[in-house]
């Protein structure tokens, strides 16, 4: 989490950086390094609910959510999120990147997103979507993608956060375990920016060991 904090300050020094955490174990190391920390309810169902609770204290008009497992986030990713939120009527925004390999496209741990012609999300799924009806039709196309890999960073309008946190989890969100589906189920538009490369996330201790920080 400290690596991510330092990285954000390095990449986007003009942005305010706050940390919304669910306990003192995470909060104190950040405070010790001079970062501003907000303690939130540990039983919230999603990261977006956590951001909503934190922003009720902060009162910011727009919020960008970078999770602590993204210590290699780049300036371009943050600015792309801001640009996606600027799309007309977008209440929420996120990032996507083309899949490099078919096995990644078929992996349920790598979330797929399909877009409309204007760059808004139609649906997110762990399943490989869309599914070809006819035998022999391409299921995956690396050259001309019809689905992208979702990158789990978000931007929000504050009014949307207030509404989102008051909504119960929908069926799709519970089935897929994807918090952004609550927004789509409620009719909100999610702007998506396609970026050139994915971030390098850290899910396991060995992932951190394999990273080279600059």
What function would you assign to each model-found segment?
Residues 14, 60, 88-91, 188:
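Short, high-confidence coil segments that cap the C-terminus of an alpha-helix
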Residues 1-9:
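Short, well-formed alpha-helical segments that are part of the catalytic scaffolds
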Residues 17-19, 63, 93, 121, ...:
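Hydrophobic/aromatic residues located in beta-strands of well-ordered beta-sheets
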Residues 138-214:
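Conserved alpha/beta core of the MobA/IspD/sugar-nucleotide pyrophosphorylase nucleotidyltransferase superfamily
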Residues 1, 27, 47-51, 78, ...:
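A general structural signal for well-ordered alpha-helical segments in protein cores
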Residues 12, 18, 22-80:
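Short phosphate-binding loop-to-helix
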Residues 75-169:
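Conserved core of the sugar-phosphate nucleotidyltransferase
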């Amino acid at each position: 989490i400290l690596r991510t904090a330092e990285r954000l300050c390095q990449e986007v020094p003009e942005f305010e950086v706050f940390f919304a955490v669910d306990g003192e174990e995470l909060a104190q190391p950040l405070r010790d390094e001079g970062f501003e920390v907000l303690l939130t309810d540990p039983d919230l169902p999603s990261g977006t609910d956590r951001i909503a609770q934190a922003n009720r204290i902060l009162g910011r008009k727009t919020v960008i959510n970078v999770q602590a497992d993204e210590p290699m986030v780049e300036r371009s990713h943050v600015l792309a999120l801001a640009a996606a939120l600027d799309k007309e009527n977008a209440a929420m925004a996120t990032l996507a990147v083309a899949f490099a390999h078919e096995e990644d496209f078929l992996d349920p741990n790598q979330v797929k997103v399909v877009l409309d012609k204007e760059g808004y999300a139609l649906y997110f799924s762990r399943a490989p979507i869309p599914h070809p009806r006819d035998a022999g039709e391409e299921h995956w196309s690396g050259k001309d993608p019809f689905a992208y890999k979702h990158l789990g960073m978000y931007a929000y309008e504050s009014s949307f956060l207030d509404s989102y946190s008051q909504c119960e989890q929908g069926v799709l969100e519970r089935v897929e375990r994807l918090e952004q589906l609550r927004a789509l189920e409620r009719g909100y538009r999610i702007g998506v920016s396609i970026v050139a490369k994915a971030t390098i996330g850290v899910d396991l201790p060995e992932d951190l060991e394999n990273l080279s920080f600059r």
